[in-house]
């Protein structure tokens, strides 16, 4: 079962979060039929969105979008406060080979921007954007948190893809210091992080999320919260129809005149919906 653990280093002002989301990323891989570079990129963005979701309040959502000039083009993951996540990659059939014995996600992403959109339950979304620093996702998220959110943060994300393309390990961790954090603790954590093995390696060794945090920081953790990560897409035919309404009466009339059923496929879960001409006529009368 995929999980997330959120806590504090005991007696210190340091927030720590870790997630293992191997099953979720493997489920997404199967839905989108991704090749290794696309799988690794999507998996990292999924893990990153879960880490950021740990800071949300009830019923809030967050979307992480990576938009680059590399062959992947766009990678998106959305997570809510219940750690329900969904994702897609614009070009799923991409494999760029290895770099330093790891899947070369940076070359697949290229140069571009990281966009974070927060749905806080208000009338408008809160959106911020930073330029990609490496395209490897983890450092880009850390840069976003440091620059846009003004929160000193360290982020590590990892996805291990087997030769048969299946996902053997996926997850990540995030460490955030606060203004009250002692300088000695910051320096200690910096040293520990420089010695830390990769996230995917720790998952492959059988560590759970709490054990990963304890391994990374080397200090006792006070657990604040545990949650379960699941892949979930809330799309419905009603939502499809509502989207068609936004096109306006003129566009709907054109669809009716063409006399063809409207076929819609959800980006996130690949579920297909059909809206018949008769349904379009009823819709036009109601708006």
From Swiss-Prot:
Under oxidizing conditions two disulfide bonds are formed involving the reactive cysteines. Under reducing conditions zinc is bound to the reactive cysteines and the protein is inactive. The keyword Zinc applies. It is found in: Cytoplasm. InterPro entries: Heat_shock_Hsp33, Heat_shock_Hsp33_C, Heat_shock_Hsp33_N. SUPFAM superfamilies: Hsp33 domain, HSP33 redox switch-like. Its main location: cytoplasm. Belongs to the HSP33 family. This is 33 kDa chaperonin.
């Amino acid at each position: 079962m995929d999980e997330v653990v959120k806590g504090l280093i005991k007696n210190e002002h340091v927030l720590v979060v870790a997630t293992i989301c191997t099953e979720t990323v493997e489920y997404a891989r199967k839905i989108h039929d991704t090749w290794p570079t696309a799988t690794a990129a999507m998996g990292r963005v999924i893990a990153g969105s879960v880490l950021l979701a740990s800071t949300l309040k009830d019923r809030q959502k967050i979307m992480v979008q990576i938009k680059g000039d590399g062959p992947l083009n766009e990678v998106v993951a959305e997570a809510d406060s219940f750690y329900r996540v969904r994702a897609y990659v614009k070009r799923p059939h991409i494999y760029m080979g290895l770099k330093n014995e790891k899947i070369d996600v940076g070359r697949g992403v290229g140069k571009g921007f990281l966009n974070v959109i927060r749905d806080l339950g208000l009338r408008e979304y809160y959106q911020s954007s930073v330029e990609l620093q490496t395209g490897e996702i983890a450092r880009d998220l850390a840069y976003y948190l440091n620059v846009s959110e003004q929160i000193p943060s360290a982020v590590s994300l990892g996805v291990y893809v087997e030769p048969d393309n299946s996902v053997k390990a996926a997850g990540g961790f995030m460490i955030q210091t606060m203004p009250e954090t002692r300088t000695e603790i910051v320096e200690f954590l910096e040293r520990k992080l420089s010695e830390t093995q990769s996230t995917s390696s720790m998952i492959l060794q059988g560590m759970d999320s709490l054990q990963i945090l304890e391994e990374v920081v080397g200090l006792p953790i006070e657990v604040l919260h545990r949650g379960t990560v699941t892949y979930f897409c809330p799309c419905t035919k009603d939502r499809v129809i509502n989207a068609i309404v936004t096109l306006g009466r003129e566009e709907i009339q054109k669809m009716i005149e063409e006399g063809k059923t409207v076929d819609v496929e959800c980006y996130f879960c690949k579920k297909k919906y059909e809206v018949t001409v008769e349904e379009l006529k009823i819709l036009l009368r109601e708006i």
